[in-house]
Amino acid sequence: PPEIYDKNAAQQTAAQIAALLKTKGCFNATVTTDTTCVKKNYVVANYNVTTGMRRIIDEVEFLCRQQEIQALLEEWKSESFLKKGDYYDQEKMTAEQNRISTNLKNQGYYYASPDIVHFIVDTTYDSQQLSILVSVRMRRNLNDSTAATLQKYHIDNFELLDFLQLFHFLIFLQ
């Protein structure tokens, strides 16, 4: 006969629910399972969820050792998805990574990507609030002891070709 109820699957589901709650700022969330046998072949699984206090963002700071990027981060601060008074939300942090890397690319930092935007979340000073430090830094090259910097690129000269010029140019390349 097929197995309908699996205790391990129920515990795994409880762990997934707890993990989801933590991404929404409920860092002390607990989820337990309770099963009841109603009939011979019928089981009811209840998930008891205690969310705890949902953390609120008290402070957001932006930091980059490159002065030009630091100035841009300060300029873009008002566009941030992370706002004082909002609940902590991992989706907003991911959106913030994407926003910063896109803005940097639009400013000529071609190699900017979401993985250069890091977060330090401090939950130690208050049980209900947290502070977030948004840091932009390049990964350090293991062969080089100097700090890596993000290179800015400029497009100096360009020429617009009409379709026929482009067609002739492409044929010439072959």
Task: Pin down the residues of each PLM region.
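Periplasmic polypeptide-binding modules associated with outer-membrane biogenesis and secretion
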Residues: 1-174
